[in-house]
């Protein structure tokens, strides 16, 4: 399966060797967001899943996954189905406040 992956955080792009690009086609086995994350290697030999998913299989607090640019994946929805050609955007929350 292939999806369009966009990574909007320069630090994450560097970790996976994407310096100079922010979007690419990713091929992977399986059919869930977790499978996509498991297919992305990082510079230290882990996968993106290893790096950003906690032992209870939820995302770390500052990771954000946007599916098809219409749905923000909740921390416990890594089994959300993806289809060939879908777009996944990976973001990091920026601390700050308003109000």
Regions found by a protein language model. Name each.
Residues 1-99:
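Ubiquitin-like/PB1-type beta-grasp interaction modules and other compact soluble beta-rich domains
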């Amino acid at each position: 399966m292939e999806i369009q992956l966009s990574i909007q955080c320069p630090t994450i792009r560097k970790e996976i060797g994407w310096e100079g690009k922010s979007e690419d086609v990713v091929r992977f086995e399986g059919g869930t967001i977790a499978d996509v994350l498991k297919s992305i290697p990082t510079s230290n030999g882990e996968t993106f899943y290893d790096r950003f998913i906690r032992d209870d299989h939820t995302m770390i607090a500052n990771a954000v996954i946007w599916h098809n640019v219409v749905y923000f994946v909740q921390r416990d929805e890594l089994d959300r189905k993806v289809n060939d050609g879908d777009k996944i955007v990976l973001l990091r929350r920026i601390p700050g406040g308003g109000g």
